[in-house]
Amino acid sequence: MTDLSNLVSQCGVDLYDAEVVNENGRVIYRVYITKNGGVSLEECEAVSKLLSPIYDVMPPVSGEWILEVSSPGLERKLSKIEHFTLSIGEFAKIILNDKTEIKGKIVSVKDDNICINIKNNESIEVKFENIKKAKTYMEW
């Protein structure tokens, strides 16, 4: 992932995450990029053009696959502690390993502890290692 991070930084953006998914029988290698103020279509295109010839020679996955480059979006997966840090002030839905569901605003991140304001200014701390799945969400 470090090499990928260094490559996308050449286009003036940061690597948010990368994943391999199987949709409708197609293998898709998704690269999510970010930067302050958001990423443009042109920046996604620049990263795609940078990665395509490299991945033609050294594919990231075996077999046939498709490369997709995009922003992580407004409602995005939080799979790394850094993602929570970048999302301070945003709402998140968190599912713990014991299947408990927590919804609230990310207030702070210290070491591997994430502080969530759940309701009536009540806050709870969650250890990152106890999180099974998390994503941001918009409250309308």
UniProtKB/Swiss-Prot annotation:
GO cellular component: cytosol
InterPro entries named in the record: Ribosome_maturation_RimP, RimP_C, RimP_C_sf, RimP_N, RimP_N_sf
Keywords associated with the record: Cytoplasm, Ribosome biogenesis
Cytoplasm recorded as keyword: yes
One of the GO BP terms on file: ribosomal small subunit assembly
SUPFAM superfamilies: YhbC-like, C-terminal domain, YhbC-like, N-terminal domain
Keyword Cytoplasm: yes
Stored Pfam families: DUF150_C, RimP_N
Compartments where located: Cytoplasm
Its job: Required for maturation of 30S ribosomal subunits.
PANTHER family (UniProt xref): RIBOSOME MATURATION FACTOR RIMP
Record's protein name: Ribosome maturation factor RimP
Organism from which the protein derives: Campylobacter fetus subsp. fetus (strain 82-40)
